[in-house]
C-alpha cells in the first residue's frame, strides 16, 4: 500500500514553462487525502518558493523537502535541516570564484538565497524563479551564517566539467552537477535520498510504501529511496536506469496522470 508520494519539481512535476494544472492537481490531491497518502515535493527550490508556486490553499499539509532536500518544512514549520558549516561554505565559494567569473553562485542560508550585486538582470530573474527570499550582497565570502546549500547556475552549461574541479571537497560535502547548467552543494551525506529517509522516519512510512518521481541526475538517490520509482520520459538515461518504471514526460503531466491511476486502483481495492 502506498502511503507517501514524492516528486521532483523542475522537469518532473512542473511542465517546461514551470507550471502545473492546479485544477487537475486538486482532483488528484483530493483522492490522495481521502486515502491518507502524504504528498511531498522534493526540490532544489527554496521551501518558501514551493509554497508560493502552490499558493496558500494548495500548499497546506504539503511536506516540502526544499533547498535541494536539506530542509523539510510542514505547515510553516521546519521539522528537519542539515546545514553546511560556514567555514567550509566560504572555502567552497572561494574555489568556485577561482574556477570561473561568468556564472552565478547562489549562497543559500536559513535567511535567504544570496547573490552578488553584480549579477546580471537575466540571472537575477532566473534566481527568483527558484527562490522567494533573495538578498543582494557585495561579497559572498563575507556571509557569516551557515549555509543551507550553495548552487551554481551556468548559462553556458559547463557544470559537468567544472564539478570535477571541486573533487578536493568530496569527503566534506555532497556535490552534484544535476544537469549541464547546475551544480548543487550541500552538507556531507545530505541529498534527496537521505532526507527522504528522514521523512519516512517522521511519518512511519517504509521504502516499500513510497513512490517517487524524478528526471535529473540529482534525483537518482530520491528514486533509490522508493520501491515504486518512476523516471520521466524526458529524464537523463542514468536516471531512467535507476528507476523501476518509466512514465510520461513532464509536459504530458506524467506525475499527475500516474497518481490518478494509482489512487483509482486503491479505491477499487
Where in this protein do the model-derived segments appear?
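Non-catalytic pre-domain segments flanking phosphatase-related domains
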Residues: 1-7, 26, 30
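Active-site metal-binding loops of divalent metal-dependent hydrolases
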Residues: 9, 45, 214-216
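Mg2+-dependent phosphoryl-transfer enzymes with acidic/Ser/Thr/Gly-rich catalytic loops
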Residues: 1-4, 21-22, 184-269
Amino acid at each position: 500500500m502506498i502511503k507517501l508520494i514524492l516528486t521532483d519539481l523542475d522537469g518532473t512535476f512542473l511542465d517546461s514553462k514551470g507550471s502545473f494544472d492546479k485544477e487537475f492537481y486538486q482532483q488528484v490531491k483530493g483522492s490522495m487525502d481521502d486515502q491518507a497518502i502524504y504528498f511531498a515535493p522534493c526540490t532544489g527550490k527554496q521551501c518558501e518558493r514551493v509554497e508560493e508556486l502552490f499558493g496558500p490553499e494548495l500548499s497546506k499539509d504539503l511536506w516540502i523537502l526544499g533547498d535541494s532536500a536539506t530542509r523539510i518544512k510542514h505547515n510553516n514549520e521546519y521539522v528537519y535541516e542539515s546545514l553546511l558549516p560556514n567555514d567550509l561554505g566560504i572555502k567552497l565559494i572561494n574555489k568556485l570564484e577561482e574556477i570561473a567569473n561568468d556564472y552565478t553562485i547562489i549562497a543559500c542560508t536559513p535567511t535567504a538565497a544570496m547573490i552578488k550585486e553584480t549579477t546580471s538582470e537575466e540571472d537575477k530573474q532566473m534566481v527568483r524563479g527558484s527562490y522567494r527570499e533573495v538578498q543582494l550582497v557585495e561579497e559572498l565570502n563575507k556571509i557569516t551564517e551557515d549555509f543551507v546549500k550553495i548552487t551554481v547556475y551556468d548559462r553556458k552549461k559547463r557544470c559537468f566539467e567544472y564539478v570535477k574541479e571541486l573533487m578536493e571537497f568530496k569527503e566534506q560535502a555532497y556535490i552534484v552537477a544535476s544537469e549541464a547548467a547546475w551544480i548543487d552543494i550541500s552538507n556531507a551525506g545530505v541529498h534527496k535520498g537521505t532526507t527522504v529517509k528522514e521523512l519516512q522516519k517522521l511519518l512511519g512510512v517504509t521504502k516499500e510504501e513510497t513512490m517517487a518521481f524524478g528526471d535529473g541526475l540529482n534525483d537518482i538517490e530520491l528514486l533509490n529511496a522508493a520501491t515504486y520509482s518512476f523516471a520521466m520520459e524526458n529524464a537523463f538515461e542514468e536516471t531512467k536506469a535507476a528507476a523501476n518504471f518509466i512514465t510520461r514526460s513532464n509536459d504530458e503531466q506524467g506525475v499527475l496522470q500516474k497518481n490518478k491511476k494509482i489512487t483509482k486502483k486503491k479505491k477499487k481495492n
